[in-house]
């Protein structure tokens, strides 16, 4: 009896975990895959254009409707974008006026540069709470940054 209850609880936990992982309404991090893409107020070409997003613009997808995705960005703005314009490339935007870039994942590593607020980079690698950033094209690394200083994956 006790083994049956444990088995039922474990099975329920696994099913719920899988439901969360495959639920398209759960937020996932992606980016805009083309330059100057219209972000709209609704899931239609007839919907009002709210703004244009640059290549690599990091977004958190909250839901999908047909060929459209609804997202939220780092300042809390929301909008709809045509799904083929969304990329699975992980990108990040710098959230602070100046973020130190280091040669490795930690404050003990040498300072190699700084990134400024609003700069967008590709996330090349993760190590704990640190992300290795690089340029969108060519994967040339620029340095490691503490993930609390960025919005992205």
Question: Predicted regions span which residues?
Answer:
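Sec/Tat signal peptide C-region and signal peptidase I cleavage site
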Residues: 23-29
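Bacterial N-terminal signal peptides that target proteins for export
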Residues: 2-13
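Boundary regions of SH3-family modules and the immediately adjacent low-complexity/disordered segments
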Residues: 31-66, 72-105, 110-112, 120, ...
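Bacterial N-terminal signal peptides
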Residues: 11-21
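Short, charged beta-turn/beta-strand-edge "cap" motif at the junction between a beta-strand
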Residues: 64-67, 126-129
